[in-house]
Curated annotation (Swiss-Prot):
The keyword Cell wall biogenesis/degradation does not apply. SUPFAM superfamilies: HesB-like domain. Belongs to the HesB/IscA family. NCBIfam families: iron-sulfur cluster assembly accessory protein (TIGR00049), PRK13623.1 (NF010147). This is Iron-sulfur cluster insertion protein ErpA. The lineage of its organism: Bacteria, Pseudomonadati, Pseudomonadota, Gammaproteobacteria, Legionellales. Homodimer. Its cofactor is iron-sulfur cluster. It comes from Legionella pneumophila (strain Paris). InterPro entries: FeS_biogenesis, FeS_cluster_insertion, FeS_cluster_insertion_CS, FeS_cluster_insertion_RrpA, HesB-like_dom_sf. The keyword Acetylation does not apply. Keywords: Iron, Iron-sulfur, Metal-binding. PROSITE patterns: HESB.
Length: 130
């Protein structure tokens, strides 16, 4: 299990403060401080791969753990990424945005060759598989 504290700028995946703040808010609503945000990639969606977001209490041996401090400077949250998903998220940014179309988590993934209109699925070139 690899643990990365993004406040040290050692991760190649950027987990934004706004995303950490939203995760902390959702964890508080669930009234379970043992929850962590898990981001995963599975086969499917209209472009071949799709992103998944879930809460998970369990940290697996192959998980990379990215710790992001919240904007209050006191609390932090953990982002969990399994080893298979991690290879497709190299250099990606996980963010939470608020706009005219509403609020949502977004992943800006430079490894994606194409993305669908909804932003939840993507494809990569065969030569990019690690």
């Amino acid at each position: 299990m690899a643990s990365v504290d993004v406040s040290q700028n050692t991760s190649d995946i950027h987990f934004s403060v706004s995303a950490a703040d939203k995760v902390a808010e959702l964890i508080k609503e669930e009234d379970n401080s043992n929850l962590n945000l898990r981001v995963s990639i599975t086969g499917g969606g209209c472009s071949g791969f799709q992103y998944g977001f879930s809460f998970d209490e369990q940290i697996n041996d192959d998980d990379t753990i990215i710790i992001q401090q919240c904007s209050d400077g006191k609390s932090s949250v953990k982002l969990l990424i399994d080893s298979m998903s991690y290879q497709y998220l190299h250099d990606a940014e996980i963010d939470y945005i608020k706009g005219i179309q509403g609020e949502q988590f977004v992943i800006r993934n430079p490894n994606a060759k194409t993305t669908c209109g909804c932003g939840s699925s993507f494809s990569i070139g065969d030569e990019d598989v690690l």
